[in-house]
Swiss-Prot record:
UniProt cross-references to InterPro entries, sorted A to Z: Ankyrin_rpt (IPR002110), Ankyrin_rpt-contain_sf (IPR036770)
ANK repeats: 79-108, 118-152, 153-182, 184-211, 212-240
Keyword annotations of the record: ANK repeat, Repeat
A Pfam family it matches: Ank_2
PROSITE patterns recorded: ANK_REP_REGION (PS50297), ANK_REPEAT (PS50088)
Name this protein carries in UniProt: Putative ankyrin repeat protein R600
SMART domains, sorted: ANK
Amino acid sequence: MHRVRKTNYFYFDNTRLDLADEDFEYFKQLLIDNNIDELCQEMCNKNKVDCFISYLVVIDDLDNFILITDRTDTYIHSNECRYFRMAVYNNSYDIAKYLLENGANVHVCNSYAITCASGFGKFYVFHSEKKEKRDTVELVKLLIDYNAMVGTDTCNLVHTAIDANRLDVVKILVENGADIFSNQSKLLKSAVMYNYDILEYLISQGIDVTDDNNSVLKFAVSRGYDCVDLLLDAGADMNTLRREDVSKAILMKGSEIIETLNNNGYDFECLNGFSNTIIDTHTSKIINILNNRVSMTDVASILLYNSKYDDNYRK
């Protein structure tokens, strides 16, 4: 009977790092027993030095990281500062800080570190063994202190933070000089999708909601996002809305959006003549049959009640 070898996996740079359970547990016990010489020898014999050091990075065990890299003469900045990038990827703050203090290139791999850190969720979960969580804001601040934003596309960093729903990171980036004006419509659309508070913050910082011919208002209306009132208050021009934008809001039963437009004086008469633009023969045939036989109010009620317009269109 063959014993199945369970394996601990963790991934980085599309490379799977693994330690078979018996090796993994053996190495850990040697570490616990402070039998460092034997540990280093066994890791070398099994060609697992890099793998075990990587594991220490993942769990942010700085003391043993320093000890093992020193005893095994491991160069800590090899492979484009791989351990540093791994530390950032796993939010291993202590090791990331140590590596920066000892010469890690904060801009390595096209500013990987600050881009990665800006895109973390509210909390990034460590390796399951430690069952630990830490807010990632401190890591972002650390990287900024080491000039990670210098020479970087900071507008893209803000966009990354918005996509991660991180108002706190957006604020830190902006407070440290991040650009929010070179691609305003992109940032606004992302904020519309992910976080009303971020949208409100960007507006408070002077971002122009009319950028790109009010494209963010068209985006919000046509996809049913409940921030139209905020955009209008900030100066968005609803007269730029197309017939298609409003019709999509109607089909999605966006009653709040339609009500907001109505309260702000939007002229829904632009929808008159919409039937003349329909080129689908099946739709035209139905309209012709129903015309003068069924009230348009009832036709609209039937269509809206039975509308299966993609509720997941907002993505």
